[in-house]
């Protein structure tokens, strides 16, 4: 099969701060080995990619590796804490293609509304982690017969559906795609 290179829309390159897990260079090398010519890297670094300087560092490391295109995803909120909006315009100017609090839901509807409004001004998508933590709790598998039979704590579908409904409604309210 011959096809164009694939794009992985959700990778964790971990640099800066967690280089013992993965660096930009090792991550893009693995991507290329698997047929991926571009990756979108999530902001869960240390420090979090919520600052233009971190974005520029990631892009510098990607340029130095020279293997695949790297598209940084900046954080929606500072420190991915869900409390204060990150400087989305500065992240865009530095090279971020989207924003996300990857792995952390934006619990505040008000903050998500502002993120959608602000990001749409820069034609940036908001990549959402839809999960109501108060419902999901410490569940590890879809709630149902199989989880119960295996003795696993269940995750109700509503834990995701509630946030999806909220954020689709906010998207309509703000006009953000």
Descriptions of predicted regions:
Residues 45-48, 78-79, 106-107, 133-135:
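Active-site environment of divalent metal-dependent phosphoester hydrolases
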